[in-house]
Each structure stands twice: as structure tokens, then as C-alpha cells.
From Swiss-Prot:
Residues forming coiled coils: none
Cysteines paired by S-S bonds: none
Organism encoding this protein: Wolinella succinogenes (strain ATCC 29543 / DSM 1740 / CCUG 13145 / JCM 31913 / LMG 7466 / NCTC 11488 / FDC 602W)
Family, similarity comment: In the N-terminal section; belongs to the PRA-CH family.
Entry EC number(s): 3.5.4.19, 3.6.1.31
Pathway in which this enzyme or protein is active: Amino-acid biosynthesis; L-histidine biosynthesis; L-histidine from 5-phospho-alpha-D-ribose 1-diphosphate: step 2/9; Amino-acid biosynthesis; L-histidine biosynthesis; L-histidine from 5-phospho-alpha-D-ribose 1-diphosphate: step 3/9
Transmembrane stretches, start-end: none
Pfam families noted in UniProt: PRA-CH, PRA-PH
Protein name in the entry: Histidine biosynthesis bifunctional protein HisIE
GO molecular function: ATP binding; phosphoribosyl-AMP cyclohydrolase activity; phosphoribosyl-ATP diphosphatase activity
Gene Ontology cellular-component terms listed: cytoplasm
Positions of region (Phosphoribosyl-AMP cyclohydrolase): 1-127
InterPro entries in alphabetical order: His_synth_HisIE, HisE, PRA-CH, PRib-ATP_PPHydrolase-like, PRib_AMP_CycHydrolase_dom, PRib_AMP_CycHydrolase_sf
Amino acid sequence: MNTLLDGIDWEKHPLLPAIVQERGSGEVLMLAYMNQEALNLTLSTQVAHYFSRSKGRIWKKGESSGHIQKIHEIFLDCDSDTILLQVEQVGVACHTGRKSCFFQKVELDSSLSLTSEAPDTSALYGVVDRLYHELLARQGADPQSSYTAKLFSKGENTIGKKIVEEAAELSFAIKDSSESEIVYEAADLLYHALVGLAFRGIHPDKIKQELQRRQGVSGIAEKNSRKDS
């Protein structure tokens, strides 16, 4: 470990604020928090990792959206209790789709205005990760507390049956229905598929990795490779 970082008193400051700045432009992108594990992961991978106070876990920036932050330099302030990361931002930093989380400008007359920068909707793909972790939180909950908790309590057979039902409804919608109805049914199918993944403890990132593996591989070759194995 870098001797400078050894000077951090983690017992006194278990979570350090981390200011994230874009390399080159100097624009401040976001503020997050790091514990010791997150900082060690950031150093070892050269990609920003943080500690989510709401989820109570380590998360890699861009783990769902792909909007990772490649580390170029790390600085500590004079009291060794605040971190500054200078990064190369892939895509956007803010979950709203904007480049920076600091897009609400407070005018000197105390009024609040928004910058005109339009959000990049590709950042919304992070909703899958958020939904997955919300589903995990429903496991073991009172079955009467929510539809999802009731599904979990009934087990894999009921979950599997619902996935089949939703797939059929999407198929019929694609054949006969409007775009809005197709989107609605596709969302239902994805939701129930995520319930199934959560039931088995499989993170959606594994599906993304599998899809990425298949890129550039013909469907016929991919199916044949499964038969061979």
C-alpha cells in the first residue's frame, strides 16, 4: 500500500468523501464515499470503486451502465480525510444522464436553475442494477407485504411459471399490439426474469458478460459449442 495512504485513520474515518474530477477539463463530476476496501479495489483495478451508504455494499462505478471511471491520479487533502480522484470518465457520471452530478446552479439571488445539458438516457440502464438489489431486499420478507415477497415465498416453480406466462404475453403483444403495450409486456417479462435471477443469487452482470462473450460469434457456432461441452 502507498505509504501516504497508510496515514489514513480508518477507525476515526471509516468512510471518506471522494471528490471525482475529470482529467484534463478539471470539471467536478460527482461526490461519493470510500471505505478502505473500496480504496484498495480502486488502486488494484485502476477503476473507481465506492461504498454505497444506501445499499451497504461496495460498488464499481458503471457496473451496470458501463460508465466506468478510469483512475489517473489520486490525491489526499492536508488532513488525510478527503480523497480527490482524477479520472477519465467513460460516458456520463450522473445517474440522471448528465455528464456531472453538479448541474443545478444556485444563482447569487438564491434562485435555482438547471443547466441546459440534455441527459444521456443510456445512463438509465443502471435501473436494472437498482431493481435487482431491491428484489434481493424482498427475499425473506413477509409474503403479505408485497407481490415480489409472495413470489419468493412460493419458490422456483411459481416464479418459473410466471416467467413463461409473461413471455407468452410479450409474444402475443409483438404480434398484435401497439408499441406501448409491447414495452409494457417486455418490462413485465424482464421484471419476472430478474426475480428468478435474484431467487438463484445470479447478478444481471453475468448475463451482460455472456451477451458480450457472444458478440461476433454466430448463433449457430455458439449453439454448437454448447453441444460440444
